């Protein structure tokens, strides 16, 4: 008996040695996602299985010789609407001295690190790798916990004491922000001006669900998008050039995965980014604290300027109390 971690078994041949001969099971599958045809997914799974049986035994299971479609295979260019997608290189080359370390809490203390709250999202590690490739240490901590409200507050205190981060990122994830108590605790602390290290307000960035958590913490409503769900779609994002959008074009392409959107209310946060219609909020910032949120995924290969946006956030410095008072006076 061994222990193994399995990824998605899209096309698999599982073999077993019997008393007299080998036996094999062929498995193939696909995924029904937004925009796909279930019937075509089933046919594709049969096609995948047939490729295995043909290579192993010389016949196509469930198909005649003429049933399977024959199509031209080619490498197609990246759509021009995306601009230059630098992340499509075989490997992002970064000097060893510039690469940050990645730790999972509890872990040894990493100096000048970014605290990344993981909300059970498959992209969390991608975000951590992107942060590290930009030269910053990162510590990952799970945002979902069964602790009560008092214990959550104590856990947040413990994490802040041990990690002493220079900044916090509230990561993306499935479901709604309230499903992740630690994420909501950090969101509320930041809005209240209580996310402090050495009397400095440390920067916080919310990504997708993390962005939604910030809105909820400030009293905004989280609703089903009136324009429907968007899954894995590069989308045109408009912005006003403030917050993490400073220095970026007023229209940029970013990858979206969301069915929920925030409705703004009067509070401490202000929208600074919208979808192409100008109706759906895609970004927000705090009036005077270093708090930003974006509804999209900047770490995605479908976000050509996403790495630049993350770098802008990572370069933000903590805000001293005296500077905060000056900003409030303005």
Regions found by a protein language model. Name each.
Residues 107-113:
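A short, charged/proline- and glycine-enriched loop
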Residues 114-136:
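Short, charged N-terminal beta->alpha structural module
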Residues 76, 83-101, 111, 300-330:
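Acyltransferase
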Residues 149-163:
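Short amphipathic alpha-helix with an adjacent loop that forms part of the alpha/beta core around
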Residues 1-73:
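Conserved hydrophobic core element of enzyme catalytic domains
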Residues 242-289:
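Catalytic beta-strand/loop cores that center a nucleophilic Ser/Cys/Thr
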Residues 137-146:
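A short beta-strand-loop structural module common to alpha/beta enzyme folds
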Residues 161-247, 251-253, 310:
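Cysteine-nucleophile active-site neighborhood
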